[in-house]
Amino acid sequence: PAFDLRGIAARTDYVVTRPAEMTLFLTAAKSDGKEGRVFCARTADGGRSFEFVSFVGDEPKGFSIMPAALRLSKDSWIAALRRREPPRNFIEIYRSEDDCGTWRRMNESIAETGQGGNPPAIVRLRDGRLFMLYGYRDAPQSIRYVTSADEGRSWGDPITVREDGGCSDLGYPRIVERTDGSVLAVYYWNDHPEGERYIGASVFQP
């Protein structure tokens, strides 16, 4: 379904909450037809039908795309958005306390992600911290992360996983916590501007 919106992009983040229920976070074109604005949709019947739930934040002057969301409790959610307001590229955090019905802006977890920006990936670790990974596209091109011990109200300084990228064409991570408490991160990567792009991986203790 198009939800009466234009330019829906398949840059989707989703959270399965029940056997037949899933909440999706997608991007649509803004009212001027340009990229982009994040919204939330939901299916309660295993994908037979979908309903629009809410926009995440006001329509931006720049863009708001490629969301990463996490359900904190029954009604509490957090969403991290790839944001651009020239000349800045950053990651902005929103929170909902009514099961995605409305959202309020919290903060910027990452003040700068480098040229063009990069989307985040987010999980809750077993020790309760929120863990957010992203690609940094300015030199030194790198994979970095931040953590929060207060459900996203504040964030620590960025920590570098690796910084040997060949150029800015990198990032788009996915993460999972392993049974030993380490984190497995996979991401789009390159070793040289003219080299092949590939999926890289790192395992580390956060």
Label the model's feature ranges:
Residues 1-206:
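Asp-box/BNR beta-propeller blade signature and adjacent active/binding-site loops
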